[in-house]
Curated annotation (Swiss-Prot):
Pfam families on file: YopX
Summary of subunit composition and partner proteins: Homodimer.
InterPro entries, per the entry: YopX_protein
Gene3D superfamilies hit by this protein: 2.10.70.50, 2.30.30.100
Protein name, per record: SPbeta prophage-derived uncharacterized protein YopX
Length: 134
């Protein structure tokens, strides 16, 4: 079984399905991302790197979404849209939908039935997408 994850090494994002990657997690929670080079696993980054981040993902509506993803949510009538940061909280991926919904402030990503959700980036590689967003 493959579990979707991505790792930010401070400069580049590495995804679970990148060729040759192997994620090793110790019982104490420490982790190391390694890449296979000529039959040898070579460390790429690990949890001791202060710029590194390990993020788990889930497939929602056919697209992988991760903690700290940036999404554009557009109402079904296409009259309003909002750019939001996805946060993993209480076991679910959540977004603030208060600007496009009178009924909800924060909702689980899978429950956004009245709108289209498009992953447009993440806070590591595209922080400018959140400029001006409250």
């Amino acid at each position: 079984m493959n579990t979707a994850y991505r790792v930010w090494d401070g400069e580049q994002m590495h995804y679970w399905d990148d060729e040759g990657l192997s994620l090793i997690i110790k019982s104490n929670g420490d982790w190391t991302l390694k890449r296979l080079y000529t039959d040898v696993l070579v460390p790429v980054v690990d949890s001791t790197n202060r710029n590194a981040a390990l993020m788990w993902g889930a497939k929602v509506r056919g697209k992988f979404i991760y903690d700290r993803s940036i999404v554009k949510i557009t109402s079904d009538d296409k009259e309003s849209s909002d750019v939001c940061e996805v946060k993993f909280s209480d076991g679910v991926f959540q977004v603030d939908v208060s600007k496009i919904s009178a009924d909800y402030d924060v909702t689980a990503v899978g429950w956004v039935e009245y709108a289209t959700i498009e992953v447009i980036g993440d806070v590591y590689q595209n922080p400018e997408l959140l400029e001006g967003v409250k």
